[in-house]
Amino acid sequence: MDEKFNDATKQRPQGERIMDATLVTIDLRSFTKQIREEKSWQDSDRNAITVFKTDGMRIVLIALHKNAEMAKHTADGMISVQVLEGQILFTTQEQTIELNSGQMLALHKGVPHSVLAKEETIFLLTLTTTLAGKNPGSK
């Protein structure tokens, strides 16, 4: 498998971070420190960095300031949300779940949901994505 790297951006001009390979190690402490030091964390109510991306799956580290809200939306694939630090309220039409550090949830695709940070929070979002050129359920 060929290694794939991120492209440099205005926010992250260094680029060249491995995004996909046969084996990718992810230093969550280092990425958490990085997103807390970036200008967008100072200027906004959130910041995020994609730490792994391949056909079929994406992993994103997300930081939210206290009271930051991700308005109601849906995901095109199944997701998991794992709180590393802090506390969020995760709301669907049926229920609201309080997730604290060390807790996680899984949610099927297409379910409308929102996220509210009750305190400064860092969480890991893992989502399944459609395989390029494949129909769902095909082998």
Predicted features by range, described:
Residues M1-G56, T91:
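A short, N-terminal "cap"/entry segment at the start of jelly-roll beta-barrel domains
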Residues S44-D45, D55-A75:
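Conserved short histidine dyad/triad with adjacent acidic residue
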Residues R58, Q87-L89, T96, P112, ...:
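Structural motif
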Residues K109-G133:
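Ligand-binding loop in jelly-roll beta-barrel domains
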